[in-house]
A protein has these predicted regions:
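Beta-loop-alpha module in the N-terminal Rossmann-like domain of NAD(P)-dependent dehydrogenases
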Residues: 55-77
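N-terminal Rossmann-like dinucleotide-binding module
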Residues: 1-52
Length: 77
């Protein structure tokens, strides 16, 4: 991930998927990357993280917001 802006995504639905796709493109340029995702369902968060190659998956929004590695949070709920 290097020096990219690490983005946390709140939510794991269609809008969140669009953002993850855009972040994967930005990661190629070293600008930003999808680093974490949070969903009320741990299973859904893990599935989303696997699909979009995201490092961390949380089952609560508070956990993601508390992660010191997250630079920016995108709210997709």
């Amino acid at each position: 991930m290097g020096n990219c802006l690490k983005v946390g995504i709140l939510g794991a639905g269609n809008i969140a998927g669009s953002m993850a796709e855009a972040l994967n493109e930005l990661q190629k340029e070293g600008k930003a990357c999808a680093y974490a995702v949070a969903s009320r369902s741990q299973e859904k968060a893990l599935e989303f993280a696997r699909k979009w190659n995201i490092t961390r998956a949380y089952s609560s929004y508070e956990e993601l917001a508390s992660d010191p590695e997250v630079d920016l949070i995108y709210i997709a709920t």
